[in-house]
């Protein structure tokens, strides 16, 4: 699909977690198109280099920082190596579905670590600096699973509902100092080729009767990151094709 190039993020630095593929990569590319310098986070240096090269090929600025978001020391190092961050996109996430009674505790703990604890400690490290400067934007990437029940989705849905609760609390804590905090609750999005049938099945349940392209969600994220959304904070924006409305 077509992409839009603006310049309203010139001079700003954005950190996008999980930015080496799928939705995170689309977000990183669009933020760069809008003028931001992007810190691309991921675990795989090869994929990170590919994303950085894709951004630079379009005339953007980017660098890669590797980190394991299930490791608290790595999270703190990621924040330090990112430097001054004006836009934080907590996109990285993991998911596993399964019956509650049979759900493995180690899998549950890892989902909580990556999906909830990592955003918490990145905000803890970076939001005070934003507040001291009087501006900043934090965008948390959630899912319809945070508000719609799915069989086997209790653990994953809980992590996304928690992230949306953090958005509200961080709004109360940081927005008086000029830091805007919002959530994008994404619907089914084509991010992994091997799960296309799943996306299509869930997409058929939406009002638009289709799944989203990553770029469609990325446009919502970059809007919230920009001055065009200067009066928007504490919101959970449902970019879900109308799934939660019907």
Regions found by a protein language model. Give the residues of each.
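Conserved glycine-rich cofactor-binding loop
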Residues: 13, 20-21, 44
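Substrate-binding pocket helix/loop in short-chain dehydrogenase/reductase
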Residues: 99-100, 104-109, 138, 194, ...
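Active-site loop immediately N-terminal to the catalytic Tyr-X3-Lys motif
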Residues: 101, 148-154, 176, 209, ...
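C-terminal substrate-recognition "lid" of short-chain dehydrogenase/reductases
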Residues: 120, 210-239, 244-245
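Active-site helix of classical SDR
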Residues: 123, 159, 167
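Alpha-helical segment proximal to the catalytic Tyr-Lys
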Residues: 128, 172-176, 230
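Residue(s) in the substrate-gating loop at a strand-loop-helix junction
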Residues: 143
């Amino acid at each position: 699909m077509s992409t839009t190039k603006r310049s309203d993020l010139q001079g700003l630095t954005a950190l996008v977690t999980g930015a080496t593929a799928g939705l995170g990569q689309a977000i990183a590319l669009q933020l760069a198109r809008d003028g931001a310098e992007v810190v691309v986070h991921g675990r795989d240096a090869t994929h990170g280099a590919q994303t950085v090269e894709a951004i630079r090929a379009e005339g953007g600025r980017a660098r890669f920082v590797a980190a394991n978001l299930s490791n608290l020391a790595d999270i703190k190092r990621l924040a330090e190596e990112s430097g001054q961050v004006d836009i934080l996109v907590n996109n990285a996430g993991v998911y596993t579905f399964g019956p509650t009674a049979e759900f493995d505790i180690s899998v549950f703990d890892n989902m909580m670590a990556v999906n909830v604890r990592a955003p918490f400690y990145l905000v803890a490290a970076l939001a005070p600096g934003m507040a001291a400067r009087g501006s900043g934007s934090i965008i948390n990437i959630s899912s319809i699973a945070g508000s719609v029940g799915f069989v086997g989705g209790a653990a994953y849905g809980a992590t996304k509902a928690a992230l949306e609760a953090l958005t509200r609390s961080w709004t109360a804590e940081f927005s008086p100092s000029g830091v805007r905090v919002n959530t994008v609750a994404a619907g089914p999005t084509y991010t992994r080729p091997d799960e296309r049938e799943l996306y299509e099945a869930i997409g058929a349940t939406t009002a638009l009767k289709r799944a989203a392209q990553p770029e469609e969600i990325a446009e919502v994220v970059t809007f919230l990151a920009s001055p065009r959304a200067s009066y928007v904070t504490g919101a959970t924006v449902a970019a879900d094709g109308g799934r939660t409305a019907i």
